[in-house]
A protein has these predicted regions:
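Intracellular juxtamembrane helix-capping segments at the cytosolic ends
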Residues: 9-23, 210-223
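Glycine-rich segments within core transmembrane alpha-helices of 12-TM secondary carriers
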Residues: 27-47, 236-244
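A late C-terminal transmembrane helix in Major Facilitator Superfamily
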Residues: 43, 209, 222-244
Length: 244
């Protein structure tokens, strides 16, 4: 429970909402992609680091060391500027903002899409490694598949943010979901080989969290930045329910 509460307090909905309010519109999509890629890089680096701590010092000491690193975050946060300037946007009551979002067809479709995104991510993370071992592949290949997803996720998230600043975000998002469907279909239809596993991991990695900067950017585009944290929070809630 405590880990879940902590993760929610430092999750994408909080970080990306801050970026959305602080960064000008012409650089917003790029900044959202950068923030998402940075979070993905942290996941990619800290997973083996944590395992190294466990192997070297044991689980209790490893937990203390990792917790100490997390404890530095609030100290570093003191240097941040705080809330962004949204004085040029009208003040909208929370209830009215929620009502407007829940009656906005595009927002509802965006939320539904993110629900499916959460299901994709949780399904692959949970079932891909045991599926590969059940087929007789080594645990090393299964671990490499997850590592490749994490590595190429950094590239995909940043690229999506950059493209979102120059192309239509809704079409980019549609293309990502369609590409996922193609990747899943090919992985199911074709004979499973180590080469296919690696290729699938790279493709899924590029598409993994590339939806995040585009989705948060679309929420800001629809409703402005004043309530973007709350409204993207509802979308992200749908994502987590899909993952559950």
């Amino acid at each position: 429970v405590l880990i879940g509460l902590g993760l929610s307090g430092g999750s994408f909905m909080v970080v990306l909402a801050a970026f959305t309010r602080l960064v000008p519109e012409d650089r917003r999509s790029w900044s959202l992609g950068l923030a998402t890629a940075a979070g993905s890089m942290g996941q990619f680096l800290f997973a083996p680091l944590g395992q190294g701590f466990i192997s070297a010092y044991g689980p209790v000491t490893a937990l203390v060391l990792m917790g100490g690193m997390v404890a530095l975050v609030p100290i570093l946060a003191l240097a941040l500027t705080g809330k962004g300037d949204v004085s040029d946007e009208p003040e909208i009551p929370v209830r009215e903002a929620i009502r407007g979002a829940l009656t906005h067809p595009s927002y509802l479709l965006l939320t539904a899409g993110f629900f499916v995104c959460g299901f994709h991510i949780a399904f692959i993370t949970t079932h891909l490694p045991p599926y590969l071992t059940d087929l007789g592949f080594s645990g090393g290949l299964a671990a490499s598949a997850i590592a490749l997803i994490g590595l190429f996720n950094v590239i995909g998230a940043y690229t999506a943010g950059v493209l979102g600043g120059h192309q239509s975000r809704k079409y980019l998002l549609s293309g990502i979901y369609f590409s996922r469907a193609v990747a899943f279909s090919l992985f199911i239809i074709l004979p499973t080989t180590p080469f296919l596993v690696i290729l699938f991991s790279i493709m899924i990695g590029l598409l993994w969290l590339s939806t995040v900067p585009l989705t948060s950017g679309l929420v800001a585009l629809m409703f402005g930045t004043r309530n973007v944290g709350m409204l993207f929070g509802f979308v992200f809630l749908s994502h987590q329910i899909g993952a559950f």
